A protein has these predicted regions:
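Active-site nucleophile/metal-coordination loop of metallo-enzymes that catalyze phosphate/sulfate
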Residues: 1-3, 11-91
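Hydrophobic "anchor" residues on beta-strands that sit immediately upstream
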Residues: 6
Length: 91
């Protein structure tokens, strides 16, 4: 079986690889493929789409924060796989 490494570095563009020689060498030895994003193009939404193959409307993660009505507060970066609906690629 061929092994695959997926390295998800938020905000890393091919132009920035010049400043990261080890990552550039890793990409050159293996491969580098562009990805198109989903909207909203924020970290938790995009990563949830990446690991489930589902659109935000289907996995339920539509931003980096969650509004809790009972507290009337937005909490940012609530990170838990339980928040993402849909089967993850490692399941």
């Amino acid at each position: 079986m061929r092994q695959t490494l997926v390295l998800d570095v938020v905000g890393l563009t091919p132009a920035l690889l010049a400043h990261a020689p080890n990552l550039k060498a890793l990409a050159a030895a293996g491969g580098l493929r562009p990805l198109t994003t989903v909207l909203p193009a924020v970290t938790t939404t995009v990563q949830s789409t990446f690991v489930t193959g589902l659109l935000p409307r289907d996995h339920g993660i539509v931003g980096n924060g969650w509004y809790f009505r009972d507290l009337a507060e937005v909490w940012l970066w609530r990170q838990s796989n339980r928040l993402v609906q849909g089967e993850k690629l490692w399941e």
